[in-house]
Amino acid sequence: MRYWYLRLAVFLGALAMPAWWLYQAWIFALGPDPGKTLVDRLGLGALVLLLLTLAMTPLQKLSGWPGWIAVRRQLGLWCFTYALLHLSAYCVFILGLDWGQLGIELSKRPYIIVGMLGFICLFLLAITSNRFAMRKLGSRWKKLHRLVYLILGLGLLHMLWVVRADLEEWTLYAVVGASLMLLRLPSIARRLPRLRGRPGVS
């Protein structure tokens, strides 16, 4: 397997954070509401992994190193895993598995609907991130996986609605996301490989 060391690093890094958070919860180091803290951290982790996934193509074009693309799918699947854990933690720690409360939560907190839409789109990408789906869907596969841009928008909107007035951290992620989208514009994406030959760019 090519770039096995990079794949292993991604695996260990993505696995380490939830393990560390669970350990912190075990020793009561997550504050007065550890359940909510876990929900928040898993959601933020999913957003960070989504941004990392989107960064792989521009990095490959800029550096010419194929290793970035080698872990793109892996990062995307970890993003889905974190989102699934985020949703599961919400159901357990916030809802308390009281499904009757879900309707009330949806009416009081519309950002949950936004988050669910993003999760459904992410689920579609996760189950089609394999060679069989690529062959089966053909040209439709690329169109389907453009949902990643919608997912990013929904994720940022979901986070914005949650943080409300505390916009400093959200702005950072929004700027990174917008920058990654700009790098995918055809007029800019075509120029990225040319930068490799310029002085100061390796």
UniProtKB/Swiss-Prot annotation:
Cofactor detail note: Binds 1 FMN per subunit. Binds 1 heme b (iron(II)-protoporphyrin IX) group per subunit.
Subcellular location: Cell inner membrane
Transmembrane segments: 8-28, 42-62, 75-95, 110-130, 147-167, 169-189
Pfam families linked to this entry: Ferric_reduct
Alphabetized UniProt keyword annotations: Cell inner membrane, Cell membrane, Electron transport, Flavoprotein, FMN, Heme, Iron, Membrane, Metal-binding, Transmembrane, Transmembrane helix, Transport
InterPro entries: Fe3_Rdtase_TM_dom, MsrQ-like
Membrane association type: Multi-pass membrane protein
Family label: Belongs to the MsrQ family.
Subunit structure: Heterodimer of a catalytic subunit (MsrP) and a heme-binding subunit (MsrQ).
Protein name (database record): Protein-methionine-sulfoxide reductase heme-binding subunit MsrQ
Gene: msrQ
